[in-house]
């Protein structure tokens, strides 16, 4: 066969093999185009896993009418003009291949309008011929790209597509990756008409943390350390997880270079070395890192899908990242976050929130599957590793061993924070538990077989009624005990103790108040302090920071509770009664849980306050029913 130049149509389809691997590849290219156009609101609509329809709508700058046809041509772009631009790329796209490649294997419709235009225009291209048709359309400022029937003219490619669920899970991963670096952009992802993801803009640090938690999980945020590290033109920021939050698979490793997610061996090696003395070789660190540097110092044009980069000074980048992460791990006690009240309101009161994953796809971490963009580690386990002491050390040289962070010797942070967070009862309180109450707690494991358990007040628990009440027996008498009222009594008794156990908040809560709310705070500050709350007051800024809470209330929505107390009617019930009325009662689905609550309440009872408990017992008269038998 003689050598000849390929037709543009065939060349585009060959190029599409690199750019358009699956529907997720199309979504990635089109969303990156929207971001390059300055969009801060992007909606992604998917049908049947992307095989039938992919629609990307944005509010970017739009494309002028005279450039619409050119936008679908190969090697046509507005992002670079000469070699100097290519050597200093900051945009996500720059080759001008995506739209041409996508349109060659699908039916593509592009509708756009610029701010200067009075009407929008639409261009349509289909398949191999790639002939375009332009006509007027109705559309706001911005662009909408619809990709229908992907691979309709390449059956061999289409048959390799997986199930709709699998293909959509790859699209979902792409959106999560992009949303993790573009905090100022709102993303909405739908599948077959149902909203699956909805990320609102996140400018403040607390809002960014909320998005990170929605993508990486709450446990990652609870164990993450904020990192800020600078040297000349290099800037490293983001979050690294403490070593005790290590992973068995490399599924929570995200790294971005100038806003672009990449895989790079230099970065992977630096991160691995920073954790080397804390993690075994079969464990992986969790991190979300953003590296900003001079675009002239990195080449992003080395991979067909731009997933890999090449640094001009690899050793400098390696040492910079290693030192930054090592410094963050070594100074865990000095890193703190403040959560804004506006970002942590009660879920029912939020008009916009991060939605939970739809049942039809795999939820977020840790069951969302392998992160294909996480750095790949291939280090083999090392034999005869040297022993390391329990004292954290960060030598300048590279260590070949590791210290197991899960060993018996706790780190400084574990001693100061985690041990305090996990403590639930003070030693004195545990000593006060009566022998009978202790027996009740141990007996709860035998409820199913015994059905009747004796409590310390000589009451026998017979049954849990509709998850709301306990049916109790004392001699020949029967009583109903409301579990909701019992919980509120238990809270009041716990908060009346002479020594109240406190729990430190890993992430302090910041309240920004109005003048009237701050005046109410000054009135009730002693009451809050008396029951175990610890605030830091900033009168000039009308701001409160909540650092510690009573352990009995550690699972409550304290943001809502505190704000409700600062706006309550002064002439209503007492402070403690009003506070307990704001707390959310637990739902009891098992008799064992209800008996634990009863035992804990009885432990707090004394001769002076036992009357409050007996008043909750409502007698049950069986005689009328027995007479009818």
UniProtKB/Swiss-Prot annotation:
Keyword DNA damage appears in the UniProt entry: yes
Transmembrane segment boundaries: none
One Pfam family matching this protein: HATPase_c_3
Keyword Transport: no
UniProt GO molecular function: ATP binding; ATP hydrolysis activity; ATP-dependent DNA damage sensor activity; mismatched DNA binding
UniProt cross-references to PROSITE patterns, sorted A to Z: DNA_MISMATCH_REPAIR_1
Keywords: DNA damage, DNA repair
Source domain of life: Bacteria
InterPro entries: DNA_mismatch_repair_CS, DNA_mismatch_repair_MutL, DNA_mismatch_S5_2-like, HATPase_C_sf, MutL/Mlh/PMS, MutL/Mlh/Pms-like, MutL_C, MutL_C_dimsub
GO BP: any one term: mismatch repair
Record Gene3D superfamilies: 3.30.230.10, Histidine kinase-like ATPase, C-terminal domain, MutL, C-terminal domain, dimerisation subdomain, MutL, C-terminal domain, regulatory subdomain
GO cellular component: mismatch repair complex
Cited SMART domains: DNA_mis_repair, MutL_C
Signal sequence residues: none
Family label: Belongs to the DNA mismatch repair MutL/HexB family.
Function: This protein is involved in the repair of mismatches in DNA. It is required for dam-dependent methyl-directed DNA mismatch repair. May act as a 'molecular matchmaker', a protein that promotes the formation of a stable complex between two or more DNA-binding proteins in an ATP-dependent manner without itself being part of a final effector complex.
Name assigned to this protein: DNA mismatch repair protein MutL
